[in-house]
From Swiss-Prot:
GO terms for biological process: eye development; lens development in camera-type eye; visual perception. Gene3D superfamilies: Crystallins. GO terms for molecular function: structural constituent of eye lens. This is Gamma-crystallin A. It comes from Rattus norvegicus. Has a two-domain beta-structure, folded into four very similar Greek key motifs.
Amino acid sequence: MGKITFYEDRGFQGRCYECSSDCPNLQTYFSRCNSIRVDSGCWMLYERPNYQGYQYFLRRGDYPDYQQWMGFSDSIRSCRSIPYTSSHRIRLYERDDYRGLVSELTEDCSCIHDRFRLNEIYSMHVLEGSWVLYEMPNYRGRQYLLRPGDYRRYHDWGAMDAKVGSLRRVMDLY
């Protein structure tokens, strides 16, 4: 199991809260989050309670201010620990409900367009492991956690559109 510590102020100062499991509502523990230390595991942070809003993927390391995790503000309201798996496999579909051209990945892909000539993915089936989807190539832009399961439409993974730029396997070792 992973371990993450949230700090209200930059540079690991101020009130802190240590967490080692999923938490749908962090508001009772701190009012703002300006720095984070991930001691172990991989985590997805959410700007709103109940795993809603912008998502931020963090792995082991120190994040002395919210810009270090590409945050837009000091609002972190929920978090998920992402379990480690040794194998990863995901199927991508060019249309919703698993229709159209299908492509499969087992490794990180820094540019979906270069690899598959697709700019949009409308549905996915995560067969093994957890993945982070990025809206732009080279692991940039909005992030979405994809855990094993079915994603019939882009709304199912929390996106506002079908734009997919890159995909990365969630692994504790980078």
